[in-house]
Structures are given as structure tokens and as C-alpha cells.
């Protein structure tokens, strides 16, 4: 078993408290101070500062003003200050401040400056002549540079970086050529290289060295021509230059104050120069370079050397303890070259002279001291090349204690809504005072039940009895020091805050004002979705314990204001991983889905989503919209978006520690949907369906391993949007871009590449660009050249794909590479309006027309046609290899004049032909996404600039009307075609039915000079006065009633007992029609009935009467063929008596008595008559001659009926029924015409008795 460690832990805890108490009474001092730095603009700078004791708090000053931790581009973490991206506003003097309950001290200044390299002065070519075997001198005026530039030379096309052979690069930047020969003649150019920015600038003109033969013109001091004054830093290497020609270096002497400068010193000879590796202040003086010859001539040049000294303090401050009302003197003796400035500080604040604070030389005098005068005093000496400070502590005694004094008062601060704010207050006193904070609502404590809160943003989701236990204020206090932190500041937190330090001797107060500005002035009010409300209300009504209430919040509330170790060691959450694709199929909505990153040890309270619309062309952006999402959500539905638009999204996660790094995404909405395409639109989930929850990493089917969606994330970020280029200076540009999705890991840096046109290599323009910086300046571009740029995003997984190259950008100015400008311009061959804001044009350019003069690109000019002002022309620049271009940002339904020029360094060509093209009509909501394509502008036949091609004929609003009318007519034609097809189909069905169950046809004769109708008469023995009953055939029945002509009276009455077919029942379903027949009375007393006789044609004999009356023609039949007769006029019939004859009839059939028809026989309906007739034979009953009915009913069928009974035969012959009868004319089918007849006659057949 392990021994009980309880007492040991208690002892350790007591020791820690004692050490803390002792250290809290120690004055702070610095272990390390920040150092000056020179850095390239856009690159990061890191400054370090550390102090003891451990209770000391570190803060920073910039140019004497306190730095806020929320300052843009600056990150402060403990003793480290990081400038994320250096810009001119962040350059200057930085100091760190260490403070505790004793007081505060300030460090020495660290200068942060931007590296830069100036330009050479433009000058004409200088010609220098040097003698052989003598010394040559090439002068160079090195431009200003920070840090000092390295000098290089380009000699006859080759670079010289260091002294080599007979070439010596002097510290001043000049070049000395020893032992000149003919090989040394040629061109010499001086160059300056900045080691920080890696810039190299070359002298534009340079020097030309000529070599001559030796002469006896004496000697000369080539450099320096005049005496020089030098101020150098101590312990630095120094070279005093003296370039002499005409004498050897051994005849050059160096003197200091008239004495030999080399003997007994650390100076040495270097050719004809005097050098030392480390100069001391004792080396200050006058140095002379003396040259003489054998003839006694002497020449000299003098250097006045001044060695500077760092500031120093020979007598510093001492700690003092005085009583109230006494006078205090602090002495500070400073030295240095130049003389340093002396500055006094009290608790890191400069002391301004007053009636109680007086400065007299090296003494600070404080009269009538009060408790507020206690603390730390500093004397700071600074002469520009060095810094020195001395610190002393002032303690004031009052009855073994004194009233608290606020050493560091809280500062006024202005923050944005939602930021993290910290107010600090340090006080001293005996005993150590207790610090309290007061707001406008009174005392602020860290107990959850007494914490002041802002109004809940979703107050309507909570019942009046609910409590908002999310901590808003957090107070961290130590002995004599206290900090008030507001985790997510809101507008309600704005106002005055008071820090009060209290002990038994009294209290002291200090005030600070907190100003809160809205995060964005157009921030939308937060809305609550139904799902959120339902989730908040889904609690057990019976569970009213505090634990169940706390479970509603992700932040754990502690019962006291003491910070737990978990909170102290926690970090800000990582950026969320956005899972949504960069495009959406919806025109006005977007579903943003994400997965939470690492929470840093504290739960995520909320997500803040900012989005705005971007403009693809100009890069202009819309206003930000901000939405707050609860930390438990992982999805947000963005609405009221614009179709076909690009949007940018920034998203951060916030916990109790603070906000994490933002995640960035750009997405594009789809085109607006048409009403006709509603069937293709994706269906929306029904209202009230919960959002898709986040899958727990430990509860999925992959044993706790989260599998990323490879279709959504490949790890590396998406390529940024195409960058936009704007002018920064004559030789530099600003490259601006918009990032896209980060690929699941936050973007750590960007890289910009550039390419000069007509070259194939992409070069790096800037790298390691911080993710918060979306613009960078690219310098040292060649004037007159055309460049393209692209951007690369970098995260933990690697580099993204390269973005689309920017539009070609031409740098101002020309390097005069080509002196001849092109004369003949291009020829515009084709223009077309591709949308309501874009026009595309194509052109041709023949280099031979300009003697193959190289060109750099084309200028495209365009303006509205109705404008006569040349200043209205706008210009697009296109590279020389292009042959087409799209002009954007035009007005809808507007005609434009378009012309072109080609250009190079020498100038522009003449204008091309002018084309006129009109943009399309702006598409209204609901119109087709694919309008009728307009006619393009045909090319002009002339290449003159004044000729104008014909304009296009744009589709206007009337074309839409024509389109609608055409669609309606097309639909009508389609309906008509369907109707005709149905009619044809119905006719075919009827033909099929008639094929298997054909009715009797009514034949119509041909219309000739006369008409003939066959009639049959019955003899007197045929019971003329009788009635004919059962005139009905099983194939169909027709009641034929023909009206007789005037003057003819009588009735043919016949009775067929049992019907025509006694063996048949009336099973017909076909419609039957009655026809009236005329009856005629002749002189012999016979009654004749005019019955249209039907022609049997081919049907002579019948084999099967009952098989649907299908008859077959027999060639050996004894029956004659009766010709088809035509229709007849009712008033012109010739009647003949019928003789009795014996005719075979169909087998007996049964029909209902009294010749009645079935119920479905309609009086006015006539079934179509088939073209082929059958002959059916059967026995029939006797004919009843006693019938007196006026009408005789006959069976309408395809066969002739023949009767044979008791030596009496009655014959029915099928006759032709005229299709023009009044009752049946509309529904009777016309039969094919019969054979032609020569005249109108009536054939009467008499029945013969056998």
C-alpha cells in the first residue's frame, strides 16, 4: 500500500501560498526585453519579453500607447507579441510592461521597421579612363536601404558579388580595379541587393571603362576627392578608403593627429586603405591619407572619425521609504555620445512636471508625498543608439500601513459586439488591498446567483422560472491585482466600470468606460427555428432539479468564482469543418452543414456565421449578415439569397475561453428555376422535420473512427477565386483574392505566384501570407510588361490547386524595347450578345500587315451607341495571343459601339472597324432560361475605322408574345391530330365488327336518265286482303313503310303465321328502322305494294343460315341474278301484278308473333348495309290474307325469303333502299353504286302458283 500523502500535499500547498505571498511583494524586473527587427511587409514579426517574479503580468506599448489584445493583425500570448502581417501602421517602437502589486516597469524600446530598397538615381553614361598597370576606380551611389544593401557589380555581363582577384568592392560600395589591363575595359553596372526583401536593383546606365597606355602625368587621389566625417558605432569594423593612381600602394601613408596611425594600434594596411576589425571610442580623431612622389609632391585627404557611445547610467536610483508629506529625491547620472535624453516614469507612466514633481538636471524631486506616490520609479536614458534604465521603489509609511493606491487603472476600451473583454486593475497598500468591481447595476461578483447578465438572446424560449446560468462575467483576483473578463460582450455591457481597492486604511476608486459597437450595423435579428423551440421545451416537467436545468447548457457552472484547472489549461476551439458543397441547386437558399472541431477542453457555446454576397467581376462585396447558432446545432439554412450569385461565409466557434480560428467557404447559388421545370426541382423536407444531428464519433459503426467524406473533402483547401489586380505604384500591384472551403482544416497561409506574358515559368511573388490577409503587394515589376497572377491556399494537409489566373495586367510605362509602334489595327469579324450584360467579339490580326512588328496586346473600346462623347469609351486590355473576348458589366437592351487597337511598347495602332451590337433583354422572373438566340452582327466588309457593321436585331418583348401564340397553335394542332386518330381508330373498330356480324346493306343505284325499282305483287289467291305478320328476319328487321302516290289506294295485307322464321326467337340487338311503303290498287282488284327489292348479287344459295348469315355463292344455282337497282322517285312507279312462284327459303326461324321487334330497335336508326348478301332458305308459315293492316313489316336482312305452304308461295326479294329517305337519311350507310341502267322502269314480278 502507498503511504498517505495527505499531509505532504497540505505542506506543499502551504509552501506555495507562502512563496506566492513573498513573490507578490517583490518588485518586477525583466529577464529578457524585446529586440528591434527589420521585416518585409506582409511577413510576421515576433517579439519576446519575460519578467520576474512569476506574479508579474506582461502588457505591451506601441509608440507609447497601450496595445489592446483585440488589435487587428496582433496576437498577444503571455510574454510574446506576434505581428501576423507587418504593415506601415504597425511599424514603430514597441515596449513591454511588467506589473504586479508593487508597481510597474517598462522595458527598453524595440523598433520594428519595414525592409525597403530605394531606386538608383538616373544619370547619363560615364566614361572612365584608366592607364594600364595602374589603378581604376568605379564609383557607385548606393540607394537607401533598410537594412543596408549589399553591393554587387555586373561586369561585361557577369556578376561580381564579392571581391575577387584585382576587383575590390569597397565598404562604401565603390569598385577598385588593381593593375588595370586591356581585359578590364567594358561596361560596369552597380547593383544593390536587400537581404530581407530579396530585391535586386541595377543601376540603369552604369559606367564604361577605357584602358589607355601609361603616361607620366603624375599621381592622383581618386577617392575620396574631399575630406570626410565619419560617425561609427563602437566595436564595429571600419575601413578608411584611399584610392590612389600613379604611384604604388607602398608610397601611401596614414597618419592620426600627425602620428603614424598603424604603429602601436589595432589598425592595419589594406592595399592603400586603413582598416580595423573593431573600433573603440579611443580611436576617435583625424586620420589623413598622405601620398608623395620622388619629386617631393604631396597630396592628402583627411577622415574625421567620431566613435559613438551607447547611453549609460553611472549613478542610478535607490529604494526609499518615507512617511506621508515628506520630500523625495531620485538621482540619475547618464552618459553617452551623443548625450542621451533622460525620461522619468512612475509605474510605467511618464511623469509630467507639476507643482509636486520637479526635474532639476539629473534629479527628480517629489514634494509632499501622498500614498498615490508609492510604487516604482524609473530613469530611462536613450541617445538613439542605446537604452539604459534604472529602477527605484518608493514606500510610504503611515501607522504601519497606508491607504490603497491604484497602480494600474483600467483603461477605456471600445470593442465590437461578441468580443472577449478584459479590464485589469492593480493596487498597492498595506495591508494588501482587496479589489472589487462595480457596474451600472452595482457590485459584480463571480457567484452564479449574483452574476449580472445581459438579456438572453432567445428569451422567448425560456419560461419565467428558468435561469440563464451561462457565466457572463469572470473575475480573477490575486493579491493587489484583479481582472474582470466578459466572455461575450453585448450592447447591455456597455457603460462605466469602477475598480475599487479597499483595505483597513481606506479605499480608492478608478473608473473606465466600455463602449460596445454592433458587430455589423446591418446584422439580422436572430430568429428561432421551431426545432430549437421544441428541443428546449422537451424537458421532463417532473424533473425540476438544478442538475436537469444545468444539463440544458453545454457550459458547466461552478459554485464559486474560482477558476478550475480545466478552465485554466483550456484553449480556444478549433475552426469547424464545413461539409457543405461549394454549389447549391437552389437559387435562393443554401444549407450550411459543418462538423465541430476540437473544443480545446471547454464545450462550444455557440457558432457565429457571417455571410455576404461577392461580385465576380469587380470584386466588390455586399454587407455582412451575422447569425448566431447554438453550439448543439450543426446545420444552418441561409435564405433570401440571390440566384446565380457568389457568397462568402466566415464561421467561428466560441467557448468560455474565447473564439477560435474562422473557417471560410465560398458557394454559388443556382439559376432561378422556371415554372415549367417544376417537375425537376428537388423536393424539400416537410416543415417540422428535425435537422440531421451530428453523428457521435464514439457511437458510429466504425468503432469510434470518423470517416471523412472523400467527395466533400480531400484534405487540402479548395483553390481560391480568381484574383483581382489593382495598381499600387508604377512598378507594383495589389493582388486580392477570396478564399474558398478550407478542406476540413483551417487555412494557415497563402502563396501568390506571377507570370510574365510570353514566358512559360510561374514564379513565387509572395509566400507565407497569413490567412487573415487577403491582399498582398507585388513589387519590382517591369514597366510596360503584362503579368498574370494566381493564388494558392495552404493548410495542414498541403497546398490547394492553383486558382484561375488573373486577367492580364499591364504595368505602366515602357522599357523602350521596341521603338516601332504597330500601324494597322485588328479587324473585328464577329460580335454577339451572349446575355443582357455581356457581348462577345472575335477578331483577326495579321502580323504581316505591320511588318511583323511584335505586339503586346489589344485595347477594346466600347461605349453606348447613343453617346457622342469619346470620353465615354471604356477600355479592356487583352493579351496579344487572344482572338476573342467577352465584354461584361453592360446595360441590358443597350446598343454599343465597339472598336479595337493593338499596341506594344512603341504605342498603339490605328483603330479597327467599328461594330455595333446590342445586349439582350433582361430576363424577367418566370421567363425561359434559354431565350431565342439573337442574330449576331455580321462582319463588316471594310476594314476602315469609320465603317460600321450592321447592328443586331435583338429579341424584344413582342417576340415572347409570338412564342406564346406559336405554342398555343401547336397544342391545338396536336389535339386535332389526336382527334383524327381516335376517329380513324373508331372507324376501324366498326369495320371489324361488321366483318363478323354484317347487317344488310342498302344499295343505291347509279343516277342515270331514269331509275328502275323492282317490285313484286301477290296474286289474288295469295289472300291479298290479309295481313302479313312476323315480317322479321333474324339478321335484322326493318319496318318499311312507303307512302303511295296520290290516287292509289289499297292495302296489301299479308299474314305470316308464326313469323318468317318460326324456329327462331327475336334475339336481334341491332337497331331497326321503319320504312313506309306505298300501296297501289289496280283495276283487277289486286293490291300492290311497292317494295324496294334488294339485289342478292353473288349470294345465290346459302349453306348455313344460322352461322352469322355467312353465305357462299353456288355457280350451279338455278336462280337468276337480279341486277342492282337505283333509288326511285315516289311519284313515278309503274306497277305490275305478281305471279305466284315457288322460291326456296331459309329454314324455319322463330320470331315473335305479330311481327314485333326487340326493344332496342330505335325507329329512326338504320344499321349499315353490308356489301355482300347471303341467301338463306327456310320454311315459312302460311300467309294470312285477311290482314287489314296498312303496313307490311319485312325483315331487314341479307337474304331473300321464299315461302312454300298449301300450294301458296309468297316471295320476298331484297330491294334497293334509297339513302335520301327522310327518317333514315342521316344514319344509313351508302352502298356502292350499282350497274348503270338505260332508263327508268319498274319490273313487276307476279307470284305464280305451282
From Swiss-Prot:
Protein name: Cell adhesion molecule-related/down-regulated by oncogenes
UniProt record, GO biological process: anterior/posterior pattern specification; cell fate specification; cell-cell adhesion; central nervous system neuron differentiation; cerebral cortex development; embryonic body morphogenesis; embryonic morphogenesis; embryonic retina morphogenesis in camera-type eye
Pfam families membership: fn3, I-set, Ig_3
Topology feature Extracellular, residues: 25-962
This protein's record includes keyword Membrane: yes
Cellular component per GO, a single term: cell surface
Gene: Cdon
Residue span(s) of domain Fibronectin type-III: 572-673, 719-814, 822-922
Role description: Component of a cell-surface receptor complex that mediates cell-cell interactions between muscle precursor cells. Promotes differentiation of myogenic cells. Required for response to NTN3 and activation of NFATC3.
